[in-house]
Amino acid sequence: MIKTKESEDNEMKIVILEADSLGEDMVFTPFEALGEVVIYRTTTADEMEAKTLDADVIVANKVPICEETIGKAKNLKLVCLTATGFNNLDGDYLKKRGIAAYNVAGYSTNGVAQHTFALLFYVLEKLNYYDNYVKSGEYSRGSCFSHFAQNFFELDGKTWGIIGLGAIGRKVAQIAEAFGCHILCYSASGSKYNTTYEQVGLDELLSRSDIVSVHAPLNAYTENLMTLEKFPQDEEDRHFSEPGKRCNRQ
């Protein structure tokens, strides 16, 4: 535990629960202008009660925020998440107690979109295989300039299905279009997107898409959304990526 300064009378207490999840270069000094600041590097669910007992504000990432973990935090007024997803919060309980909760919306749009393509190209381009092949010296020793042991296809002309067309999904669609892909989209909640992309049902998206990526929050609509049975079993060269919130949990 790090206590940045001594508390003063009637000063708000801010408890940062998972500092390590933010990286070693994170600076917390701006919080000191708002009140007493206590920093914990990590926090488990079992440690929550003791660490939040007299907190006015807690700053968390993935630790569960519910009656079992903050039920005795009688001064708690605000939960700040250093992430986008709300799936670790019991929203009904927080609303019942009048505790506000805020996330960091939109901070990762470009990064997650970039990572989506990093995952795709690693698999699609067989990068692990060809990296090892070149490093082994086999390419240099080979008698033929070409090597076709692992084939891959171009994105141009392929169909990319996107589950969840929020900010990240739209960014992925924009990049995929630049590669020449046709975009399909699906809304797990049944909402109609304001988009020119073709919106279809889940089964149609899975059957028509060469590539499928999920960019949806983990909630009641997406829990167990993806199961093995939903994927076409007779197709090869299809790619599925889920840089979202574990919508294929069993």
Set out the residue ranges of the language-model regions.
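Phosphate-binding beta-alpha-beta segment of Rossmann-like dinucleotide-binding domains, i.e.
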Residues: 99, 105-159
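Rossmann-fold NAD(P)-binding glycine/threonine-rich loop
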Residues: 87-97, 244-250
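N-terminal Rossmann-fold NAD(P) dinucleotide-binding loop
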Residues: 169-170
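Glycine-rich Rossmann-fold phosphate-binding loop(s) that bind the pyrophosphate
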Residues: 165-166
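Short beta->alpha connector loops at strand-helix junctions that form conserved
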Residues: 41, 82-83, 99-110, 187, ...
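N-terminal glycine-/charge-rich "phosphate-binding" loop or analogous flexible N-terminal tail
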Residues: 1-55, 184
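Rossmann-like adenosine-cofactor binding region
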Residues: 65-69, 184, 188-250
